[in-house]
């Protein structure tokens, strides 16, 4: 799977209607529960539309999740933020960053009923249909289930700046050398030769191995959430 293109964006609904086909090898690792999981985790996956990066923080009564979707072609990365109180979804906030930016914010009350709804395209307010709200809600729950499996399977997202010697300075300040397949390393090197700055890379690590997810000129670390800020 050539999951390495620079991030892009498509209209929000086209992504949320898309299939959630996980990278097979990585999903196979996400099959057993582990009660020792840390409260703040980062994971992700690639499907036939693009790459999804997931940051998540669990507390005793809340789950907070941020996803970044980077389509393989045509556009820029879009983000989605979710909150659950217990198992009840309380917030959906979606942003697509393009020439016609789109923003969606939906809140649900303690009884899981819709309590607030906002939809803007290029700063102009538009209506959301009940079907659209239901779709966003359905996709949120699917992503929660996917995140559960990836966390339990120890599928970990790592990001940082690539160096000529094959090492990466991660967003946490560590210097590591990802154990990537040769084609992935060669692709990064090709991208680096056409860039005036060190490229950013995102990759997944799991018990079964590592997989390159994204390569881009942008600095992923400038906006990657941290446990303290999330």
Model segments located where?
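C-terminal motif of bacterial Sec signal peptides marking the signal peptidase cleavage site
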Residues: 27-30
């Amino acid at each position: 799977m050539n999951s390495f293109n620079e991030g892009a964006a498509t209209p929000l609904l086209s992504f949320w209607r898309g299939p959630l086909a996980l990278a097979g090898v990585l999903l196979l690792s996400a099959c057993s529960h582990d009660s020792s999981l840390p409260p703040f985790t980062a994971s992700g996956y690639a499907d036939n539309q693009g790459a999804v990066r997931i940051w998540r923080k669990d507390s005793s009564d809340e789950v907070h999740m941020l996803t970044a979707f980077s389509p393989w072609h045509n556009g820029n990365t879009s983000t989605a933020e979710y909150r659950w109180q217990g198992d009840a979804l309380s917030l959906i906030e979606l942003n697509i960053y393009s020439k016609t930016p789109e923003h969606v914010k939906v809140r649900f009350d303690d009884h899981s009923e819709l309590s607030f709804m906002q939809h803007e395209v290029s700063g102009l307010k538009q209506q959301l249909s009940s079907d659209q709200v239901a779709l966003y809600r359905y996709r949120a729950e699917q992503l929660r289930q996917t995140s559960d499996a990836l966390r339990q399977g120890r599928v970990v997202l790592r990001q940082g700046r690539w160096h000529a010697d094959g090492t990466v300075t991660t967003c946490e300040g560590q210097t590591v050398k990802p154990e990537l397949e040769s084609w992935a390393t060669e692709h990064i090197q090709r991208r680096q030769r056409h860039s005036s700055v060190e490229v950013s890379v995102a990759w997944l690590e799991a018990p079964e191995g590592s997989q390159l997810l994204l390569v881009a000129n942008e600095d992923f670390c400038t906006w990657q959430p941290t446990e303290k800020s999330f």
